Regions:
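Short loop/turn segments that flank or connect secondary-structure elements
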Residues: 1-157
Length: 157
C-alpha cells in the first residue's frame, strides 16, 4: 500500500467527506453502524496495519488511568515514572504521549507493548464501534491518519 498516496487522496477528498458527515448527521440511516462495520471488515481484509502504522507515527492515544497502570506494570515501573518519562497532559487535560512517533513503535511497525497497549490503540480506528453517529467528527479527522478510514468514508459516499 502506498500510504502517502492514500493520505494525499484523503486530503483531496476532505470536502466530500465533510459533506458526507453533514448529510449523515442530518439524516442518519438506521443501519449506519451496520454499514460502517461491514466496510470496516472489508477494508481490513485488504489493508495490513503493519504496512502503515501511521496512527502510531503521527498521533497519540489518550491514556486513561487504567491504561497507565497496565502499561507501567508491563514495563516494570511505577505509574508516576511512566507519566514522567512518556506522557504529558494536553489542552483537554488528557494524558498523551510526549513524542511522535510512539516510543513503543519498532522499526518493523510492531508495537513493543502490544499486550499492554492503551484502549484507544486497541480500538483504533474506531470504525467498528456502536453509535458511529456520535463519533463522526473523530472519524472525519481519522481519514487524514488512517487509509482504511479514508476508504470506508469513500465507500459510504
Amino acid at each position: 500500500m502506498d500510504v502517502p498516496a492514500a493520505l494525499n487522496r484523503a486530503a483531496h477528498e476532505r470536502k466530500a467527506n465533510r459533506k458526507l458527515v453533514s448529510r449523515l448527521r442530518d439524516r442518519p440511516p438506521k443501519d449506519l453502524d451496520y454499514r460502517f462495520h461491514q466496510l470496516h471488515e472489508e477494508a481490513f481484509r485488504d489493508i495490513d496495519c503493519l504496512e502503515c502504522a501511521n496512527c502510531c507515527k503521527t498521533t497519540s492515544p489518550i491514556f486513561r488511568d487504567i491504561d497507565i497502570d497496565r502499561l507501567s506494570r508491563h514495563l516494570g515501573m511505577r505509574p508516576a515514572e511512566l507519566v514522567e518519562r512518556y506522557l504529558h497532559l494536553d489542552a483537554e487535560g488528557d494524558y498523551v504521549l510526549n513524542v511522535a512517533p510512539c516510543p513503543f513503535l519498532g522499526p518493523d511497525n510492531y508495537c513493543s507493548v502490544y499486550e499492554a497497549r492503551p484502549r484507544a490503540c486497541r480500538e483504533y480506528p474506531h470504525t467498528d464501534r456502536k453509535n458511529m453517529l456520535g463519533i463522526l467528527s473523530l472519524t472525519l479527522r481519522n481519514t487524514l491518519v488512517c487509509p482504511a478510514v479514508a476508504r470506508i468514508m469513500r465507500r459510504l459516499r
